[in-house]
From Swiss-Prot:
Necessary for normal cell division and for the maintenance of normal septation. The lineage of its organism: Bacteria, Pseudomonadati, Pseudomonadota, Alphaproteobacteria, Hyphomicrobiales. Mg(2+) binds at residues 52, 74. One of its GO terms (molecular function) is metal ion binding. Keywords: Cell cycle, Cell division, GTP-binding, Magnesium, Metal-binding, Nucleotide-binding, Septation. Belongs to the TRAFAC class TrmE-Era-EngA-EngB-Septin-like GTPase superfamily. EngB GTPase family. GTP binds at residues 45-52, 72-76, 92-95, 159-162, 193-195. One of its GO terms (biological process) is division septum assembly. This is Probable GTP-binding protein EngB. HAMAP family: GTPase_EngB. Pfam families: MMR_HSR1 (PF01926).
Length: 216
């Protein structure tokens, strides 16, 4: 992905994400969502896949999104806003697939995620985070299918790539690419990242601002 992105774009993205990003809103239900303003880019994934860590790595602000070793801690849609010229917000979605949570809570999270995906006109893309150590699970496929049915554009981001051997990682990327052929709303390119060593972050930042520029 690096080869396809202009170095000037990567630098512009770095500067934008190094700006003043702040938490602005937490929504436990669609009734409490903030007014639609500008564009929104959301991050979805299984519990403990590294969504909050990725948002912190993107913005270079370790405390922006709260991280936790307890699966299922993020139970709301969390909105972050950047510099005035950014033109978009970041949305940290509740983690899914946490089997130990009460069934009523799982149902509530599922409803919130589905309603948000299907009714948010300002949402331009969902980045679905997949743990590079494990690949796409059944629960991930369920979410991808929901995105397909909702006609919401999404892209796969592999996380924790630093914890996978290079040969195994290449196989994981190939298998994920093949799996995406079944999903019409999926963007074909996969972003490989590590929040620990920041690999893939420049490319992901650049991809986001390129997308926002195209949709603005």
């Amino acid at each position: 992905m690096t080869d396809e992105l202009d170095p000037a774009l990567i630098e512009r993205a770095r500067k934008l994400f190094a700006g003043d990003w702040q938490f602005i809103w937490a929504s436990p239900s669609v009734e409490t969502l903030p007014p639609m303003q500008g564009l929104e880019v959301a991050f979805a994934g299984r519990s403990n896949v590294g969504k909050s860590s990725l948002i912190n790595a993107l913005t270079g602000r370790n405390g922006l999104a709260r991280t936790s070793h307890t699966p299922g801690r993020t139970q709301e849609l969390i909105f972050f806003e950047g510099p005035a010229d950014a033109g978009f917000r970041l949305v940290d979605m509740p983690g899914y697939g946490y089997a130990a949570a009460p069934k009523t809570k799982i149902a509530s999270w599922t409803k919130l995620i589905h309603q948000f995906l299907q009714g948010r006109a300002t949402l331009v893309r969902v980045y679905v985070l997949i743990d590079a150590r494990h690949g796409i699970k059944d629960v991930d496929n369920e979410v991808l299918t929901t995105l397909d049915k909702s006609a919401v554009s999404y892209q796969i981001v592999l996380t924790k790539a630093d914890q996978v051997k290079p040969a195994e990682l290449a196989e994981r990327v190939a298998a994920t690419t093949e799996a995406l052929r079944k999903h019409p709303a999926a963007f074909p390119e996969i972003v490989v990242t590590s929040s620990r060593n920041a690999s893939g972050m420049p490319e992901l930042r650049a991809a986001i601002i390129k997308l926002v520029a195209e949709r603005s």
